From Swiss-Prot:
It comes from the Bacteria. NCBIfam families: purM. Transmembrane segments: none annotated. One of its GO terms (molecular function) is ATP binding. Pfam families: AIRS, AIRS_C. The keyword ATP-binding applies. It comes from Saccharophagus degradans (strain 2-40 / ATCC 43961 / DSM 17024). Its main location: cytoplasm. Belongs to the AIR synthase family. InterPro entries: PurM-like_C_dom, PurM-like_C_sf, PurM-like_N, PurM-like_N_sf, PurM_cligase. Pathway: Purine metabolism; IMP biosynthesis via de novo pathway; 5-amino-1-(5-phospho-D-ribosyl)imidazole from N(2)-formyl-N(1)-(5-phospho-D-ribosyl)glycinamide: step 2/2. GO terms for cellular component: cytosol. The gene is purM. HAMAP family: AIRS. This is Phosphoribosylformylglycinamidine cyclo-ligase.
Amino acid sequence: MTDSKSNSNSPSLSYKDAGVDIDAGNALVERIKSVAKRTRRPEVMAGLGGFGALFELPKGYQEPVLVAGTDGVGTKLKLAMQLNKHDTIGIDLVAMCVNDLIVGGAEPLFFLDYYATGKLSVDVAASVVEGIGAGCELSGCSLVGGETAEMPGMYEGEDYDLAGFCVGIVEKSKILDGSKVAAGDVLLGIPSSGPHSNGYSLIRKVLEVSGASLDDKVGDTTLGQALLEPTRIYVKPLLELFKNVQVNALSHITGGGLLENIPRVLPENTRAQIDCASWELPPVFKWLQEQGNINAVEMYRTFNCGVGMIVCVPAAEAANAIAQLKQSGEDAFEIGKIVAAEGAPEVDLLNL
């Protein structure tokens, strides 16, 4: 039997001695509360601090269907850390989740975040959460909770990782699943703000081989600013569009670019034809292509190339859809069409 008595000559250890500062975590929670309050929807039934968030289903639905999604922002975080700019990366986190939900026709209801770090910096984490709150306000959903994990030894210093989780709601009869897509439908593009939150491992490789500085000019901004521009949130304009226009499908252009994401919402025996000459490649993508010597097909299967969301509508609805989106502040434009084809859906890139 071993002696379980403590060694009186050794110091009394605390959680903080092991690298976990409970007081810092509590201080962060206090700063988060005001952010959560700004995003609060009437269906939220309790504040932060409980073991689980309570949320009442909105009224007015006959057959409500819940839609859930989770995502992160990938290695864009490395650039945020490099530039010590953390106030917009939270917008990216929310955008990646809520833009996926709207593709199914769902209105985002509530959001939770996961923040993991080696050593908690309350100021950095609070800045990130401010961005999350801004993203929730832009998409109309409530920040109802989250988890802050301080894990010394798992992450280097104050480096951190993020994950987001979102739940939305849609009437069963109004789910967008691509089943109504038909030959002759028109594809409309809604502009992105830049690479959004995808392709950053390739972006960082281009930065490495080019030797470029993040202070270099690209278009009318710096390279660093162009690459950290937050992901656009399309939720509110699209929810408004649903009220006035028949939308057959949406495609959120994320990892995999146009080539991989458009087929995800197309039925069998259809294919998308995209006219790449229908919009100009934004400066940051031109820079990446030139400095990385990236071929055109690789560009369109890695990046959004200036189009963050694609809207599929019947041809007769195209002009109305463009007008409605412009009323909501979105400069939508026609980029292609759906044609009949045998087999699994694919994308034809025309005028590359």
